[in-house]
């Protein structure tokens, strides 16, 4: 068997033979196929300069965070209610069962409630942004909060819908103001 290394030049080892590459003469554009861009592509420069979520991402974000937040807050509230409802003389198993059942029941209700509010808010915000020709400002968020409150409590009557709309508008205004304060004073 022949040694592929030439040892005749002393300490320098030179390779006599090169490794066979079956694709050397084939010029396929496979490199271009797998060299994908890392940033999103836009048709117009105006789209690239705006930093906002698409309507689908917006919908997923607000619905998911609403459900998770409602579930955590509901579980906490249900656990406290389960602890308060415990009676003297109950065994540890029964107390634990009562706490878990109460926490799970309230967590489901809270998660579904805030998840549906998040879904409505995301839909309203995307709709208001579309109606305002893509202007995604603070006024859009406040209008979406107001409309979400009105829509959420519309089945309870007009007075309840107006109050819920005011609460939604104030909550959205507080969120916008809080976001500006955080941007100004918190170095991120």
From Swiss-Prot:
InterPro entries: Tim23-like. Component of the TIM17:23 complex at least composed of TIM23, TIM17 and TIM50. The complex interacts with the TIM44 component of the PAM complex. Essential component of the TIM17:23 complex, a complex that mediates the translocation of transit peptide-containing proteins across the mitochondrial inner membrane. Links the inner and outer membranes. It comes from Arabidopsis thaliana (Mouse-ear cress). Keywords: Membrane, Mitochondrion, Mitochondrion inner membrane, Transmembrane, Transmembrane helix. The keyword Membrane applies. Expressed in roots. Detected in cotyledons, leaves and flowers. This is Mitochondrial import inner membrane translocase subunit TIM23-3. It comes from the Eukaryota.
């Amino acid at each position: 068997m022949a040694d592929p290394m030439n040892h005749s030049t002393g300490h320098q080892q030179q390779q006599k033979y090169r490794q066979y590459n079956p694709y050397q003469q084939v010029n396929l554009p496979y490199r271009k196929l797998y060299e994908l861009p890392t940033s999103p592509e836009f048709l117009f420069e105006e789209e690239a300069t705006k930093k906002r979520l698409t309507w689908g991402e917006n919908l997923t974000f607000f619905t998911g965070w609403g459900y998770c937040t409602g579930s955590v807050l509901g579980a906490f509230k249900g656990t406290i209610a389960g602890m308060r409802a415990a009676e003297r003389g109950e065994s540890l198993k029964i107390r634990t069962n009562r706490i878990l059942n109460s926490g799970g029941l309230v967590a489901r209700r809270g998660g579904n409630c805030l998840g549906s509010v998040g879904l409505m808010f995301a839909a309203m915000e995307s709709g208001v942004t579309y109606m305002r020709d893509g202007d995604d400002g603070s006024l859009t968020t406040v209008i979406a909060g107001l409309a979400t409150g009105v829509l959420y409590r519309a089945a309870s009557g007009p007075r309840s819908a107006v109050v819920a709309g005011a609460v939604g508008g104030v909550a959205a205004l507080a969120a916008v103001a809080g976001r500006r304060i955080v941007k100004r004073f918190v170095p991120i």
